[in-house]
Regions:
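Sec-dependent N-terminal signal peptides of Gram-positive bacterial secreted proteins and lipoproteins
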Residues: 2-31
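N-terminal, intrinsically disordered, polar/charged segments of Gram-positive cell-envelope systems
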Residues: 26-138
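Amphipathic coiled-coil/heptad-repeat helices and related helical stalk/stem segments
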Residues: 93, 182, 341-342, 412
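C-terminal active-site subregion of NodB/CE4 polysaccharide deacetylases
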Residues: 101, 107-199, 214-219, 223-227, ...
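Metal-dependent polysaccharide deacetylase catalytic core of the NodB/CE4 family, i.e.
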Residues: 145-165, 209-211, 218-225, 233-403
Length: 484
């Protein structure tokens, strides 16, 4: 935490502390070329029921016997946790308060300084509190129904490898965004006043289980938005196609990506959304509301965050060809260590403001999949993904699908009632409207806008509130972008 505050202090000094809904468009689909891969994760459709039952039978008993041994249920404490806690106790309260205030947590900053033993005699603290109170007075409550939600898939680092003409190139062109495009999009949104918030800021769950509207207070000119990214598992099919291979915690305790170069060497850096946003927020801390970052929508069939943590890699049963090849290429694969490493990354991410959502274990189309299959799928997510990433009350539906119409969920909706019974209260689909938000006593629902090659090429006018497509478009992207 001390490193974080030290990194942003200079940026804070340069930032001033002063400062009806669209019609719904039919839900769009999210990465169709993942459909066959997700189905293959459980075998062909005609034998899916039998295969799932067999795999559950194979692993149910062994899971209870081995989960402690494989690390899924072990604690997440890291070797340097005590050191981090000691550092936090020694942080400069003025710097802490400055970071809180620049990220719009004026109450937190004021409370922190007023709680210091020497506050009554410290004129610097008193002056800072006065500044924070004055800035807070300029804030207004932002209309929750006018908060947009944008999302990306894994970012392309090397366009030559991604757009090399193979069977996946068209899909990458449609549904992915390059790092160069992403950086320009984020800069444009920052320049326009956008600030990252969370669905948990927009709606809160009360002690009695009901849901209430949240309140987001921002200075004039600031615009809240939600950011998410789908499928941050670095699937096997993406190997060698110009994408990062995993997320890691580097020697400085920061989350970065590993990238395998053409010659097989491994580079570490900002090669996907998580480290890129982390770096951007260090330089522009006012891009984050109360320290919020984005949400990662996670499947589990190929593991998480680039780590092969699904139980199939441990049992060796029901493996797909690319999973078999991975194990053959890595004869020293250690499942327990893989789980431990993934937990370390997830913990570091959450400490920096990132959140996780279910994307279903098998990248399921929730509209087309039976309730029984969804129950089995969610059981796998909770058994093999949640122990690594943590429990979540958010589900971001794959393929842009949904479990109900635009009118809302009702108590006679069996899929909704099931997901609610499993603790999910925040639901997101894909919708190209500028904003689509529903907040009821029972659930929060929000549509997401895809910022990818297809949307930028065919509907640039729909993104003009965020950025000018002509200014962010990567010239190395092949045109025309394939249609749907």
């Amino acid at each position: 935490m001390r490193k974080k505050i030290a990194c942003v202090t200079a940026a804070i000094l340069s930032i001033s502390l002063g400062v009806s809904g669209c019609g719904l468009i039919p839900f769009e689909q999210d990465i169709p070329f993942l459909s066959s891969r997700a189905e293959n994760a459980e075998t062909e459709k005609k034998t899916e029921q039998q295969t799932i039952d067999e795999q559950d039978a194979d692993t149910e008993k062994s899971t209870e016997d081995t989960q402690q041994d494989d690390g899924l249920n072990e604690g997440e404490q890291t070797d340097n946790e005590d050191t981090e806690e000691a550092d936090e106790k020694q942080e400069n309260p003025m710097e802490q308060a400055a970071l809180m205030a620049v990220q719009y947590d004026y109450d937190g900053a004021i409370e922190l300084l007023k709680s210091q033993p020497d506050y009554e005699s410290n004129t610097d603290m008193q002056s800072a509190v006065l500044d924070y109170e004055n800035t807070k007075a300029t804030c207004t409550e932002y209309p929750l129904e006018q908060i947009t939600h944008v999302f990306f898939h894994t970012l392309i680092k090397d366009t030559a490898r991604a757009f090399d003409g193979d069977s996946d190139s068209n899909g990458y062109n449609q549904y992915m965004t390059t790092i160069d495009e992403f950086n320009k999009i984020i800069q444009s949104m920052y320049d326009k006043g956008y600030v990252m918030v969370s669905p948990h800021d927009m709606a809160v769950i009360n002690e009695d289980g009901t849901m209430s509207r949240g309140s987001i207070m921002l200075p004039p000119g600031k615009i809240p938005f939600v950011l998410s990214q789908d499928d941050v598992s670095y699937y096997h099919y993406m190997d060698g196609d110009g994408f990062a291979s995993k997320l890691v915690v580097d020697s400085n305790g920061e989350v970065k990506n590993e990238y395998i170069e053409d010659d097989g060497s491994v580079s570490t850096g900002d090669y996907d959304m998580v480290p890129l946003i982390d770096t951007f927020v260090k330089e522009h801390p006012d891009f984050s509301y109360h320290g919020r970052k984005g949400i990662l929508a996670m499947t589990g069939y190929d593991g998480v965050l680039g780590y092969r943590t699904d139980i199939a890699y441990k049992t060796g049963k029901k493996l797909q060809d690319d999973q078999k090849k991975f194990l053959e290429d890595h004869p020293d694969f250690n499942y327990k260590q893989e789980v431990k490493n993934a937990k370390k990354v997830a913990k570091a991410m959450k400490a920096e403001g990132w959140e996780f959502a279910s994307h279903t274990w098998g990248h399921k189309d929730v509209a087309a999949t039976s309730l029984d299959d969804l129950k089995r799928d969610d059981k796998k997510w909770k058994k093999y993904v949640a122990p690594i990433l943590g429990e979540t009350d958010m589900i971001i539906f794959a393929f842009g699908a949904d479990i109900g119409s635009w009118e809302g969920y009702s108590t006679d909706n069996e899929k909704y009632e099931f997901y609610k019974s499993q603790g999910y209260r925040y639901f997101c689909n894909v919708d190209s409207s500028q904003y689509f938000v529903q907040i009821t006593d029972d659930y929060f629902r929000q549509g997401r806008r895809n910022l990818d090659g297809y949307r930028m090429y065919y509907n640039p006018e729909m993104l003009s509130d965020l950025f000018d497509v002509s200014e962010v478009w990567d010239s190395s992207r092949p045109t025309p972008v394939p249609g749907m």
